[in-house]
């Protein structure tokens, strides 16, 4: 399947991307993982979605631009473990849904700077980000929809090939399916899904496979 087109920019706002590597730990297990770090950026400012593993690489990507905030799709360590170093270097605020505080608190003693809630609307330049609370992979999991760019930053809620994992603590398969069907599948087919791990997909590419996911149970 060909990769979906990622819009280059709108009103000077563009999407930038890097992959960082590290480990994910939960329930006594540890796994090596590669994570996507997404930036909404202009020439002078940027907003980071998920601060995974490598603060140096993330700060290099930010460069001399002002980091206006860090949005955390959820509280698993592999998505937030560079948060303190990035905050210390930039003074940027970190946003997290409060239902994931028990996961966050395993990683850092410093609280998030602000709460996310479903229905929130955040603005970066000419781009609005709609916060969608999509529990299932984690209780506080959130996706960020940028209608003007035609993209959804899905974290670990939706991937190419199905929903995020639900076999560990604080996760639930029926809940993630409800989040996807009641929120994400209402988006246009052409919406590009930029995921927390791996390649991009579209809503239209994933919607027809819902019954397959239900049949396999994950």
Show the residue positions of the predicted features:
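Histidine-centered catalytic micro-motifs
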Residues: 70-80, 132-141, 194-200
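Short Gly/Pro-enriched turn/cap motifs at secondary-structure boundaries
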Residues: 28-30, 113, 133-135
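Conserved hydrophobic "DFG−1" position in protein kinase catalytic cores
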Residues: 39-40, 96, 123-124, 144-146, ...
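C-terminal regulatory/interaction regions
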Residues: 1-3
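Metallo-beta-lactamase
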Residues: 46, 110, 128, 139-218
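Hydrophobic packing within well-folded, soluble alpha/beta domains
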Residues: 86, 122, 129-134, 144, ...
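Conserved beta-strand hairpin/beta-sheet module of binuclear metal-dependent hydrolase folds
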Residues: 10-65, 143-154
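Active-site HxH/HxHxD metal-binding segment of metal-dependent hydrolases
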Residues: 32-33, 46, 51-128, 208-216
């Amino acid at each position: 399947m060909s990769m979906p087109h990622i819009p280059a920019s709108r009103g000077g706002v563009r999407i930038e991307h890097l992959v960082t590597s590290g480990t994910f730990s939960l329930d006594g297990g540890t796994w090596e993982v590669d994570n996507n770090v997404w930036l909404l950026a202009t020439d002078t400012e940027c907003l980071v979605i998920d601060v995974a593993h490598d603060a140096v690489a993330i700060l290099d990507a930010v460069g001399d631009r002002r980091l206006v905030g860090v949005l955390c799709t959820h509280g698993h360590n592999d998505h937030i473990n560079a948060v303190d170093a990035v905050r210390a270097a930039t003074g940027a605020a970190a946003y997290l849904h409060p239902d994931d505080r028990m996961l966050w608190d395993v990683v850092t003693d410093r609280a998030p700077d602000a709460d996310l809630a479903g229905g929130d609307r955040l603005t970066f330049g000419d781009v609005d980000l709609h916060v969608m609370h999509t529990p299932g992979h984690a209780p506080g999991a959130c996706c960020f929809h940028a209608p003007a760019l035609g993209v959804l930053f899905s974290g670990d809620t939706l991937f190419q090939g199905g929903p995020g994992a639900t076999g560990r603590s604080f996760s639930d398969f029926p809940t993630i399916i409800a989040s996807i069907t009641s929120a994400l599948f209402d988006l246009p087919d052409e919406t590009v899904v930029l995921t927390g791990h791996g390649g991009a997909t579209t809503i239209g590419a994933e919607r027809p496979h819902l019954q397959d996911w239900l049949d396999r149970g994950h």
